[in-house]
UniProtKB/Swiss-Prot annotation:
Keywords: Cell wall biogenesis/degradation, Lyase, Signal. The lineage of its organism: Bacteria, Pseudomonadati, Pseudomonadota, Gammaproteobacteria, Pasteurellales. Pfam families: DPBB_1, SPOR. SUPFAM superfamilies: Barwin-like endoglucanases (SSF50685), Sporulation related repeat (SSF110997). This is Endolytic peptidoglycan transglycosylase RlpA. One of its GO terms (molecular function) is peptidoglycan binding. Residues 216-291 form the SPOR domain. Belongs to the RlpA family. Gene3D superfamilies: RlpA-like domain (2.40.40.10), Sporulation related repeat (3.30.70.1070). The gene is rlpA. InterPro entries: RlpA, RlpA-like_DPBB, RlpA-like_sf, RplA, SPOR-like_dom, SPOR-like_sf.
Amino acid sequence: MKQKIFQILTALCCIFYVMSAQAIDAKKLYGLQGPKLIYQAPVTKSHHYVVKGVSYRTQTSKEASGYARDGIASFYHKKFNGRKTASGQIYNENLYTAAHKTLPLNSYVLVTNLRNQRKVIVRINDRGPFVKGRIIDLSRAAAREIGLIGSGVGHVRVELIQLDRQGRISGAASATLAKLAKNQEAVNMLLQGEDTVELTQHTEEKTVKAATTKPEKYTTVYKIRILNLDSKKQAEKLISKLGREDIRADITVNQDKFDIYFGPFSDKSQVNDVKAQLRKLNYSKPLIVYTFDD
């Protein structure tokens, strides 16, 4: 029995060592402040909770993988320092953490201050902010890093970061991280391109009054997003080569690059058809398929 217990403890120590060894230093690889990035087991079940009469549904890891939102960020008041968070951890204003209403606890996000383009990585370990119009509540350290202390609130972009067991990075933030890579190792950590096309459920943060007795019905809608084109002209050329006048195509500016959104599509077969056409064009830019509830 003692030998068996020893073997189990040894195995657990090995697992802990491997996981620790795979911690990613975002400062070294991408020049970003934040916690060490460590693989977390995927969250496979969502749950509901109610605050101030409003019901929220948390996202699974699969649903959250394409999460990218622009909105208003705030940061914790000093009085919350030392209090317990929704994850059970104690809030420490000097660590890079944040509160979000629906993203999985212990997931990571890249937060960009859209006024000055300063960035920080934070770990979600709490729920909130429960103030209308705000999408994330940052720790004081994170807010300071992106220049929010003076204003108190700011317009930000929040993009999810996901890691697999090998420590490779995917999720909505991967395109932004690719532009920040300091070396080849940083580039190699990112899952991008044709081999990493992902089908991700992009769930809007819809709120329903707790008094509602029947769940609302939503229609699943799909969009295709192509990342990191070098110019608007290149984006327009790709749309022209695709030759699909029946499909809406929107070009958006992403810092010094351009993205294309095709859709919305109400049928997954349409999505697969357009993906196949893009492949025939030998298109190699990162391609993500989003689904969301309309």
